Regions:
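Helical cap/lid subdomain of alpha/beta-hydrolase-fold lipid enzymes
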Residues: 103-238
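Sec-dependent signal peptide hydrophobic core
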Residues: 5-9
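Positively charged n-region of N-terminal signal peptides that target proteins for export
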Residues: 1-3
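Boundary at the C-terminal end of the N-terminal hydrophobic targeting segment
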Residues: 17-19
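N-terminal signal peptide c-region/cleavage motif recognized by signal peptidases
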Residues: 13-14
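Serine-dependent carboxylesterase/thioesterase catalytic core
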Residues: 21-34, 38, 44-58, 62-161
Length: 238
């Protein structure tokens, strides 16, 4: 039923983008594709084909998840025969999976990438709270790799050599985690730790890590970057 609904939206939409452009959406740790549904609908309305991927974020290390999730998204986009360009919109861990994949594989159709709240420099919360009972059950092996220590995967990856826009949040609904993070933060990642050398644009929004992907301002900024490679004249620059 979901595929029928999305196909109908694609048939009747008349946005600026065309169906030759496909967007892979990757959710964050311990989330599902449902968290990206509002973003997906907006992108379809803008004329993009989409591949909103579910992947088992708590079951594998990042290196394995990157292959599982990104490969699935690329395959779904390529299955839509008109696709000539593949973009990515990611939340949190999803952005690290794209970085990991692109460090190992080439993607000739690669377009632009928008990362929402990515722990590009790791998150101090992992190091501070990693010994709390239940951490591994909630976050799985990939969660352990998102810190700032010797096992950090993000810190072992290189700068962006692709068109990247990063959106960072400054509102928290998680005071416990925020207490161990440098200010400002979104409840999971500090603003400073979302940055990545080589990124094309960067913007700060007053939203939380958990819900930023559902906020209209974030959706509008995402569409702007996918279309132009810039967040435009948006507030929140520093």
């Amino acid at each position: 039923m979901r595929r029928v609904f999305l196909a109908a939206m694609l048939l009747f939409t008349s946005g600026l983008a065309t169906a030759t452009e496909c967007v892979v959406l990757l959710h964050g740790l311990s989330r599902s594709s449902l968290s990206m549904n509002k973003m997906e609908r907006a992108l379809i309305e803008a004329g993009y084909a989409t591949a909103n991927i579910d992947y088992p974020s708590r079951d594998h290390v990042i290196e394995e998840l990157a292959v599982i999730a990104v490969t699935a998204g690329i395959a779904e986009c390529r299955a839509q025969s008109a696709t000539k360009r593949i973009h990515f919109v990611t939340h949190s861990l999803g952005g690290i999976l794209v970085r990991q994949y692109l460090s190992d594989y080439e993607l000739p159709e690669l377009g632009r990438v928008v990362m929402l709240g990515p722990p590009n420099q790791g998150s101090a919360a992992v190091d501070a709270l990693g010994d709390v009972p239940g951490f591994d059950w909630i976050n799985g092996p990939a969660g352990r790799q998102l810190g700032k220590g010797a096992d950090s995967v993000p810190l072992g990856l290189g700068p962006a050599d692709f068109e990247l826009g990063v959106i960072a949040g400054t509102r928290t609904i998680d005071p416990v985690t925020s207490a161990v993070l440098p200010d400002p933060d979104d409840g999971k990642v500090s603003v400073e730790d979302t940055r990545l050398e080589g990124m094309a644009d960067f913007v700060i929004v007053p939203h939380s890590h958990a819900f930023m992907m559902r906020m209209q301002r974030v959706i509008d900024l995402t569409k702007a970057f996918l279309a132009t490679g810039s967040f435009g004249d948006a507030d929140g620059r520093d």
